[in-house]
Amino acid sequence: MKRALRIITIIFLALTIVFTVTGGAGTACVAWNADTLGGNMSKMAPVMPQLKILVVLSIAAGLWGIYSTIRLSKGKPGGWIYTVIFLLAGAITSGVQYYFSATLRGSTAPNSMRLYVTVFTLLIVLLIRLPGIWAKIGFDRPGKGKSPELAGGAALFVSGLLTAATPLWAAPNHLFKGYNTAK
């Protein structure tokens, strides 16, 4: 059970990292070009400066997430708190973008998925810190045996699938003048 919890936690962290980095990078088109996009996205023009900041912060949070997840999985000091900081930064940047999208254009997709996954992962990371679970799962010490390699491999596999499948799940929300910009 402890091995499964460790693997599930790392997989969700990897998914959140992918969503955070791709979400930040994907927002760049709106952050720099909302006034020229037309349609619903043109409604985001008043907040272009804020979106530019969110792009930088989201990508930085995703990179910090890579660092913190490696520290956590290896049982290094500060790994858990660094991971919480990453998840809070990701949730805040995604939440602000969610708010702008909902109020200005009336739709939150695809950022809504990023926000939900980040908050869910944050809940997992907070729950594993409960004393009974924390002692069993062992994120405060280096993993034994093949557990770290298995968790890392599973996380890379799932992240790779998610990245390769991006045109499938992102395409419906990335149409510009009838052209699918996600393909």
Q: What are these model-derived regions, one by one?
A:
Residues M1-K183:
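Topology signature of small-to-medium multi-pass alpha-helical membrane proteins
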